[in-house]
Amino acid sequence: MSMFCYQCQEAAGGRGCTVKGVCGKTEDIAKTQDLIIYVVKGIAIYSSQVREIGLNTSEADKFIVESLFSTITNANFDAKALNARVQEGLKIRQSLKDAIIKAGGSYNSKENKSWTSKFLSVLGIKNDKDEKEIHDAAAWAANNPEDFKKKAETVGILATENEDIRSLRELLTYGLKGMAAYLEHANNLGYDEDSIHAFMEKALVATLDDTLSADELTALVLECGKYGVDVMALLDKANTSTYGNPEITKVNIGVRNNPGILISGHDLKDMEELLKQTEGTGVDVYTHSEMLPANYYPAFKKYKHFVGNYGNAWWKQNEEFEAFNGPILMTTNCIVTPKASYKDRMYTTGVTGFEGVKHINASKDGKKDFSEIIEHAKRCSSPKEIEKGEIIGGFAHNQVLALAPQVVDAVKTGAIKRFFVMAGCDGRMKSRNYYTDFAKALPKDTVILTAGCAKYKYNKLDLGDINGIPRVLDAGQCNDSYSLAVIALKLKEVFELEDINELPISYNIAWYEQKAVIVLLALLHLGVKNIHLGPTLPAFLSPNVAKILVENFGIGTISSVDKDIKMFMN
């Protein structure tokens, strides 16, 4: 069976990648990632039961989160690392099974009826005759890459034959992947929430349950949105408690003459460690793409060698990494297949990886030694200037709510007629230029609220301000879409409205990968309707599942700039 992947917006032909991923992943990588998801589901079968009888699940929790994150689009292309993850997962699964037995429980209901009946029901075990047959995800075993390869042939997306059930299972899985990404960042800062792990396990096991109806899976998808809000709130708390609340900041986009390190991705803990370790070395630090919002946090402003932001969204990295001249640290997705001209200057860390690229692991205490990349930087030329000037950002919920009287007054007087939430992702497709044209064409009495790398389509345009309020308010990274929700809920309260949809806010969101999926599900949970997704609707939505989203939530897509602006403004 050939590979099949349709988890990102650029899925080939709007249907799915079957030969090689548009992202660059090979068939082997794609299938190994399928197997990792299968292993994680098997672990969830046991860890949910270990959790139920009160035993420690921290090792399994960490593995599930990191494994889901490692399969996000453009995160990890290292076959050796991915196969090692499969091997580690099988060991963790066995340790959970052993823990159940040691505690006097059983994974077989014949030995212990008291707490395994629920366990068996979610596995699709329908009668006593089948009770000895634990789901294959919890039972299969292998110990080498060749056996993994054979197993991977049988567990891909298309193993679920019913199109609608498959669609709902994948929608749920992609929501979990986005959730895992945000939870991993919070965990790195010492913040966690057991209920989120418990839901992830429940949802993973549910994707194996052939007895669940489409309605039951739909309910789980919507519940996923509830935990999406929870995980974004947790990460917001982790980030702001550790580094302070983002504040209005002018960010330099030019360069200096010192050698530099370019840090990309989302992990602020890595950002902190790099800034600490480069201080006093003569090496400057620049952010790239989704790391731009690090410039908004007070804790990072004390570092004089933190210069600003270099470049644009992730998909332009081939040219921009080449021009940077110094080493690049990828803390998370998005990785584009590196050019030979800079591959030896590229480093990965965390769940990311690319074959032939140096990887920096954390020690047992979670610390990372960046000395190698720092010494590498010292041997490199300073970055080539590709832009100059400044951009402004830092409009997360705390900062915007501090401006609430000014914003509310502008709305009441009619100076601001409408807000447009244009959060989300950027990508390669030329059709995404729609978002630049849309921003340019918006009436002058409108304000864009953004988060995520979608901002790069318009954050360098001169769109002016309204009574001193910039017409583009950048809250931060994609997870900071949470800030936009907090702002909307506060405005609902201020204007004493019954329904969040009564606010003069329209949602025109550009999506790309699985973190955008959890953001969407979170917005749906909060009751937001009439969200428009583009540049295309997800390939993983079957016609019937898409119909559910359209009929119940008013989900739509984009058409032309003029038609859409007219529709939104009316």
Swiss-Prot record:
It is an enzyme of class 1 (oxidoreductase). [4Fe-4S] cluster binds at C5, C8, C17, C23. It holds the Pfam family Prismane. GO terms for biological process: response to hydrogen peroxide. One of its GO terms (cellular component) is cytoplasm. Keywords: 4Fe-4S, Cytoplasm, Iron, Iron-sulfur, Metal-binding, Oxidoreductase. InterPro entries: HCP/CODH (IPR004137), Hydroxylam_reduct (IPR010048), Prismane-like_a/b-sand (IPR016099), Prismane-like_sf (IPR011254), Prismane_a-bundle (IPR016100). Its main location: cytoplasm. Binds 1 [4Fe-4S] cluster. It is found in: Cytoplasm. It catalyses: A + NH4(+) + H2O = hydroxylamine + AH2 + H(+). The modification Cysteine persulfide is found at C425. Its cofactor is [4Fe-4S] cluster; hybrid [4Fe-2O-2S] cluster. Hybrid [4Fe-2O-2S] cluster binds at H266, E290, C334, C425, C453, C478, E513, K515. GO terms for molecular function: 4 iron, 4 sulfur cluster binding; hydroxylamine reductase activity; metal ion binding; peroxidase activity. Catalyzes the reduction of hydroxylamine to form NH(3) and H(2)O. This is Hydroxylamine reductase. It comes from Clostridium botulinum (strain ATCC 19397 / Type A). The lineage of its organism: Bacteria, Bacillati, Bacillota, Clostridia, Eubacteriales. The gene is hcp.
